[in-house]
Amino acid sequence: MPSDSSAKPGAAGINGRRNFLTSGAAAAAALATAGVATHAAAAPAINPYADPAKPMLPPSTMQLDLSRTALVVIDPQVDFLSPKGVAWGAVGASVQQHNTVENLSRLFAAAKANDVTVAVSPHHYYPTDKGWKFEGALEKLMHKIGMFNRLSPYSMEGFENSGADFMPQYKQHILDNKTIIASPHKVYGPEQNDLVLQLRKNRIDQVVLAGMSANLCVESHLRALLEGGFEVAVVRDATAAAILPEGDGYLAALTNFRFIANAVWTTGETVARLSARG
C-alpha cells in the first residue's frame, strides 16, 4: 500500500503514478487494442459492440417522465476522462472511441436546458482509506496509482485540477448549486453513499445513467438502482472502460446493459428524450 505521502496529488506523485500505468496497464491496453485492430483488418465487417442483427430479448418500452427523471453521472473526474489522469493508459482508447467526454457534455447541457434533475456520484479516497486489510484487483490498482486521492474530506487543499477533481468542462453544470453531488462512493456501487436518498427525496424514480467506468461503477450503480426500484436507462456511448489482457471492460458491460437495463440508448437518442418536455 502507498504511504500517506502518496495521497498528496502533487505533480511528481501524479507523474510517477501515470508512468506506472503507462508502462504496465497502458502497454497491456495497447496490446489488446492492437489485437482487436488485427482481427478487424481480417474481418472488417465485425464490430464487437454492434447491436445483434436478430435480437432475442424484448425491446425496451421505457418512456421518460422528466418530472421524475434524473441524469446520474458517475465519476466525471480527471483521473478517468483526461489524458492527464492516472487511469488514462487503461481507459483512454475506449474513452476516445466512444467520444465519451463530449457525449457527457451533451447530456449535461441537455438536462440543464430542460430543467431535468442532475446528480453526480463521485469517487474519492482519503488517507484513511489506504489501510484496508483486503481489496479486489481493481481496488488494489486504484490505490497503487493514487486514483481519486484527496488529502481530507474536510479540506480542498490540492483538490482543484487534481485527478479527483471534476473535468473542467463539466464544472459549469456540476457546480451550479442545483446539481446533486452525492457523498463519495468507495468501491463501485452507491450502497455506501447518499445517492439513493437524494433521488428519493426529490421523488425521482427514473434514472438516465452515464459516466465511468462501464463495467465497474456504472454497472454497479445500475444493478443497485434496479434492485432499489428505479427504472434505469444506460447511455451506451457516454461511458467507457479499460481494455486489458484480462478482458474488454466495455464489451462486458454492454452485454449486461442489454440484459438488465430498462433501456440502452445512444447519446443522440437520450438528448432527444431529455428535450421532449411537454
Segments predicted by a language model, with ranges:
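Active-site-adjacent betaalpha module
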Residues: P2-A27, A42-A70, D79, A110-N114, ...
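Surface-exposed, active-site-proximal loop segments in enzymatic domains
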Residues: P83-G92, K133-F134, L225
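Short beta-strand segments at enzyme active-site cores
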Residues: V116-H123, V235
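A short alpha/beta connector and helix-capping loop motif
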Residues: G85-A111, V116-T117
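Short catalytic/ligand-binding loop motif for oxyanion handling, primarily in non-cytosolic enzymes
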Residues: Y126-K130
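N-terminal signal peptide c-region/cleavage motif recognized by signal peptidases
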Residues: A37-A40
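Short hydrophobic beta-strand that contains or immediately precedes a catalytic carboxylate
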Residues: V72-I74
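Oxyanion-hole/transition-state-stabilizing segment in secreted/luminal serine hydrolases
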Residues: P76-K84
